[in-house]
Amino acid sequence: MEVTGVSAPTVTVFISSSLNTFRSEKRYSRSLTIAEFKCKLELLVGSPASCMELELYGVDDKFYSKLDQEDALLGSYPVDDGCRIHVIDHSGARLGEYEDVSRVEKYTISQEAYDQRQDTVRSFLKRSKLGRYNEEERAQQEAEAAQRLAEEKAQASSIPVGSRCEVRAAGQSPRRGTVMYVGLTDFKPGYWIGVRYDEPLGKNDGSVNGKRYFECQAKYGAFVKPAVVTVGDFPEEDYGLDEI
C-alpha cells in the first residue's frame, strides 16, 4: 500500500501583532525552532524576540495554542497555510509605535557595544544556546524527528485501508472498527490512521477542521497513531449501546 508524501517544507501564514493594526502574509520554513522564528519576526513586528509571546490561530481564526516551546520546531505545531500567528509584545511598547517610521530614532552602534547589550538577537541566541550557537543539538533534533517520522511511515504502510482493526489507546478500552484512511493530515504532523468504529465511540465523522478524509457517521470516526492499531480478524462486538 502506498502512503501519501511528506508535508511541504514551508508554510504561508499571516502575522499580526499587539503593536500594530495590520497583518502580513509571510512564508517560513517548518524546520525553524520557535526561538529562531521569533528572531525572524523582530524586524516585522518591532518587538524583541525575548519579549514575544506567540499565539496560533486556525484558518477560521479560532485560537489553537500558544507557541511557547523555544526549542520546538515550527512544524511540530498544527501550523497550516492560511493560519495566523499573533505576536503579543511584553516590552512595554505602545500600539502603533512602530507604524510611523518618522518617529524611529536612527543611530549606529559599534560591534563591541552591540555584543555587550543583553536585548539583542545575538545575546538571546547565546543565552538560549540556539541557532548557530547550538547547531549540534538542532541537527540531533532534526535527525530524531526524521527517524520518528520514518518509523511512523513504516508502521502506517503495514496497515491497509479497508482492514478490520482494534485500537488500544492509553486510558481507553479496546475499540474495534475498520481502517478508512492512512497517511499524513493537515491538522497535525506525522502519520495518522483514520478509523470508523463499529459503535459511536469516536470524535468526528471522518473530517477535521472542515477537511474530509473519509466518510462515516458522526461520532464514529477517529484518528489515531499507527502504534496503537492492530489489524486482523476482529469481528464486530456487541457493546450494548442499543439497550435501554
Swiss-Prot record:
Assigned GO CC terms: cell cortex; cytoplasm; cytosol; microtubule cytoskeleton; microtubule plus-end; nucleus
Protein name: Tubulin-folding cofactor B
Organism the protein comes from: Homo sapiens (Human)
Cleaved signal peptide residues: none
Gene: TBCB
Modification type N-acetylmethionine: residues: M1
Family membership noted in the UniProt record: Belongs to the TBCB family.
PTM field: Phosphorylation by PAK1 is required for normal function. Ubiquitinated in the presence of GAN which targets it for degradation by the proteasome.
Single Gene Ontology BP annotation: cell differentiation
Lineage: Eukaryota, Metazoa, Chordata, Craniata, Vertebrata
Phosphoprotein found in the keyword field: yes
Domain CAP-Gly: 183-225
Organ and tissue specificity: Found in most tissues.
